[in-house]
Amino acid sequence: MSRRNVAKKREVSADRKYNSKIVAKFINHVMKKGKRALAEKIVYGAMEKAEKQLGVPAMDVLTGVLANISPAVELRSFRAGGVNYRIPVPIKEERSRFIAFGWLLSEARKRKGMCSRDRIALELLEAHSGHGGAFRKFEENVKVAESGRAFSHFRFFNTGGARRSNPSNNIGGNR
């Protein structure tokens, strides 16, 4: 077991335009190879485009999208009796937001023939209205969680692996 200290969570500073930590987290999620200025340009452009099309403030668009596609449970795999079960486990709001951003960006990146700003804006619009790729992933997550609810009692068991006895205690060669 490691003797090091547990890494402390660092606070994300709010973004410049909307003064929101949620937007700052979204920018960090979009950012690749440390190019923050480019990520900010993409996110702000996408939010402005969504704001123009919906006629709703950009922050309300983003919070509406997160309300529509943030999962309440995460599916964790558990092996019991030679069968893998996907068990729904409740998650914190921060983890839920992280998963929602991942779904949103993965579905936006699947769209071809547009710039990143337009792809993200289109995905934001669709997720806000309750359809689109990210919303489909959310619904699929809910369905699988419903079907795995019967096995949710497994989450209280130790999932750290099988218990093994100390081999030096096995006198006589019993394994």
Curated annotation (Swiss-Prot):
Spell out the GO cellular component terms annotated for this protein, sorted alphabetically and separated by semicolons: small ribosomal subunit
Q: Which Pfam families match?
A: Ribosomal_S7 (PF00177)
Give the Gene Ontology MF terms in alphabetical order. rRNA binding; structural constituent of ribosome; tRNA binding
Q: Which GO terms describe its biological process?
A: translation
Keyword annotations for this protein, in alphabetical order, are: Ribonucleoprotein, Ribosomal protein, RNA-binding, rRNA-binding, tRNA-binding
SUPFAM superfamilies xref list:
Ribosomal protein S7
Q: CDD domains from the entry? A: uS7_Bacteria
The record's InterPro entries line, in alphabetical order, gives:
Ribosomal_uS7, Ribosomal_uS7_bac/org-type, Ribosomal_uS7_CS, Ribosomal_uS7_dom, Ribosomal_uS7_dom_sf
Alphabetized PROSITE patterns for the sequence: RIBOSOMAL_S7
Among NCBIfam families, the record links this protein to: rpsG_bact (TIGR01029)
Record's function text: One of the primary rRNA binding proteins, it binds directly to 16S rRNA where it nucleates assembly of the head domain of the 30S subunit. Is located at the subunit interface close to the decoding center, probably blocks exit of the E-site tRNA.
Which family, according to UniProt? Belongs to the universal ribosomal protein uS7 family.
Q: How is this protein organized at the quaternary level?
A: Part of the 30S ribosomal subunit. Contacts proteins S9 and S11.
Q: What is this protein called?
A: Small ribosomal subunit protein uS7
State the organism of origin.
Neorickettsia sennetsu (strain ATCC VR-367 / Miyayama)
